[in-house]
Amino acid sequence: MQGMRFERCDSAAPVTLPSHATILSGLFPPRHGVRDNGTFVLSPAVTTVAELLSQAGYDTAAVVSAIVLARRHGLDQGFRLYDDDLGAGVSAGSAVEERQAEATTTAALAALAGMRPPFFLWVHYYDPHEEYRPPSRFADAASGPHRLYDGEIAYMDSEIGRLLAALPAATVV
């Protein structure tokens, strides 16, 4: 499996919902109309990559890990399955309701098991966000002033690795 490394990445907005509306629509916030987290909803008139792929015969599924991307905000357009059920994997003490990376990966693997090729599976991880609370094995492996943040990154990286290992060999990532 091959990947791509980006040495610079800019976001369309400094908050989650408008940034992800841009990722899925290819439009900047002034065009798609989602300008902040909370009450904004992506208009059904905006076409998403999931809608285009679904129309082209792809099976589509999404697994998201934060309440700010709940289906009520319209990002579910074009997805046959949109798993925004944070369920038992919700991180205690977090400022935002979020599903931790391990639970997100487990949900993504369940979605993947029910998909037929060709498929588009979009998996959203909310780690790392404050409060930084990585599992102790990741926090203990890091050091320095950014130990908890680095532990969150290592934890998420481990879970993405678990997901990638389960993908069929010819999968384009």
Q: Model-found features: residue ranges?
A:
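Catalytic domains that recognize anionic headgroups
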Residues: 1-173
